[in-house]
Design a protein with these regions (language model features):
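Charged catalytic cores and adjacent phosphate/nucleic-acid-binding surfaces used
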Residues: 1-25, 29, 115-133, 137-222
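Extended substrate/RNA-proximal surfaces in nucleic-acid metabolism proteins
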Residues: 1-144, 212
Length: 222
């Protein structure tokens, strides 16, 4: 089953949307993914080079840094941490100080705007996929954001995830029943398929039942 995850911005919240079982060659998802990957990579490079300018890390060029990373369509802070560990600049165990410095980049230098919920969901659905509201924490239910995303075309929801509280999981399950949503699970960067190729994967897995998987494959809810 094909899969991809995007980060959208809505009402001050960052909401992740996962696309499942889509046609990975469809122009809608290819063009959208390329646009997002290019934007994220440029943003990551800007934040990385800003850390160098502020003296937070040694002057290692961007090109040298990424040469130590697994080849990927885009680069994020996880890849910076991964490469700096290999280069002996900062151990993976001490990565918090790198992540803090990364977030302190001058906002005026950052021009990439996270994709909208509408554009993200449309790209996934146009490619024949299921648009899943990923790891919806309690605030997304309390603020009505989950309902808004469903109204925008989201037709799936993660009901099992390491970041979800017991209440959030119950709310997700109830939403799945009420709105006939496909159910999925996820581990993000904690599983063997993490952004760094599993090099620092935490063995935690949160999936779904075989029936829930087949429901997606068979498009039982349309």
């Amino acid at each position: 089953m094909s899969g991809v995850e995007f980060c959208t911005k809505y009402q001050g919240e960052e909401i992740h949307v996962t696309g499942l079982d889509f046609d990975p060659t469809h122009p809608a998802i290819v063009n959208f993914s390329n646009m997002v990957c290019e934007g994220y990579t440029e943003r990551t490079r800007t934040q990385y080079e800003d850390m160098i300018e502020r003296g937070c890390i040694p002057n290692i060029t961007w090109e040298e840094l990424v040469s130590y990373c697994p080849k990927t369509p885009f680069y994020c802070i996880d890849h910076i941490v991964y490469a700096l560990d290999i280069l002996g600049v900062c151990s993976f165990a001490d990565q918090d100080k790198i992540r803090i410095a990364y977030r302190q980049c001058d906002p005026s230098k950052l021009h990439f705007v996270r994709p909208s919920a509408d554009d993200t969901i449309k790209a996934i659905r146009d490619a024949g996929g299921v648009a899943v509201i990923a790891h919806p924490h309690e605030a997304l239910f309390d603020k009505g954001i989950v309902k808004d995303y469903i109204a925008k075309g989201a037709n799936g929801i993660e009901i099992n995830h390491s970041e979800l509280t017991e209440r959030a999981e119950k709310l997700a399950c109830h939403a799945a029943i009420e709105y006939n949503l496909y159910c999925s699970g996820g581990t993000d960067h904690t599983g063997a398929m993490s952004a760094c190729g599993g090099a620092y994967a935490i063995p935690v897995y949160h999936g779904v039942t075989e029936d829930e998987y087949r429901a997606i494959k068979e498009r039982r809810f349309g």
